[in-house]
Every structure is written in structure tokens, then in C-alpha cells.
Regions:
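Acidic, metal-coordinating catalytic segment for phosphate/diphosphate chemistry
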Residues: 1-17
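A generic fold-level signal
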Residues: 11-13, 21, 83-85, 106, ...
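Conserved Nudix-box catalytic region and its N-terminal flanking loop in Nudix hydrolases
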Residues: 16, 21-61
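Functional cleft and adjacent loop/helix regions within the main domain
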Residues: 40, 46, 93-94, 116, ...
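A short coil-to-beta-strand element that immediately follows conserved catalytic motifs
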Residues: 65-75
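Active-site-adjacent beta-strand/loop module that shapes the phosphate/pyrophosphate-binding cleft
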Residues: 77-100, 112
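NUDIX/MutT-family hydrolases
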Residues: 90-92, 102-132
Length: 138
């Protein structure tokens, strides 16, 4: 039913993702409901700032707390997705130590640290892949 609504209205949804970097590697997660790698993140709730949504999703999905000041906006993009327009802010944070990642095995079923050169060869959510490629170009 929602897909029919999306096809007719083409609403804009808002999301926030966080690329976690440590020791030259990036954390990729696999969600139970999509066939590709992504980063911790999700929908921005009505009235919520994207940065706060990113912080909330980090705790919910991988049990990690960082401060708002540690997040840097890496990429902001709007693209068609499942009959709607998805506006996504991708943040990144450089971690000094490798954190313990707690996967809930419901929404997030896998978390792996990989070199960015490897990440861009994997089936990664396209806007996220663009942010990783941008990071490589610096």
C-alpha cells in the first residue's frame, strides 16, 4: 500500500548515515532487509535534525556513542529510491580506537571493517559508495 502511495505522491524521505573510519578502514553493515552493504543510519524522524538522527542510529544499530562535534558532513544527496525521493546526509567520524560493535541481528546482521579500496568494489548503497570514493580522492 505504501508503494502505491509513493508512486502517486513521490514524497521526499530524509535519512542520515555515518561512515566510521579507523586505522584506514571503514565500517560497513548489512541490514536484514536490503541486499547491499550500507553504514549505520536510517530515517530522520519528523522534527529531528539529521545529525541527531545519525547519533541516535549509531547507538540503536551498533551500540556506539559519539558526540555531534565529531560528525563531519561528507556528502548530501537527493536521489530516486523505491518510487520516492530520498534525501540523505552522510556523515563521517574518525575514531582513534577500534570500538566494540554490537550487532543486534535483527536490523543489522553483519558489520565488517574494510579498506576503502575494497569497499568500493562491493555491493554498497550507491550514495555511500560515492562518499567512500570521495574520501579516497582526498
Amino acid at each position: 500500500m505504501m508503494r502505491t502511495y509513493w508512486r502517486l505522491r513521490r514524497p521526499t524521505t530524509h535519512g542520515a548515515l555515518v561512515l566510521l573510519w579507523n586505522a584506514g578502514e571503514v565500517l560497513l553493515v548489512r541490514n536484514s532487509y536490503v541486499p547491499f552493504y550500507s553504514a549505520p543510519g536510517g530515517f530522520v524522524k519528523r522534527g529531528e535534525e539529521a545529525r541527531n538522527a545519525a547519533l541516535r542510529e549509531l547507538v540503536e544499530e551498533v551500540g556506539l556513542r559519539v558526540t555531534a562535534q565529531e560528525l563531519t558532513l561528507a556528502l548530501e544527496v537527493t536521489f530516486p529510491w523505491e518510487f520516492k525521493q530520498d534525501h540523505v546526509k552522510i556523515f563521517e567520524v574518525q575514531l582513534n580506537e577500534r570500538p566494540v560493535i554490537k550487532v543486534d541481528n535483527r536490523e543489522v546482521i553483519q558489520a565488517v571493517w574494510v579498506k576503502p579500496e575494497v569497499a568500493v568494489t562491493l555491493n554498497v548503497f550507491p550514495p555511500l559508495k560515492a562518499a567512500i570514493q570521495q574520501h579516497l580522492a582526498v
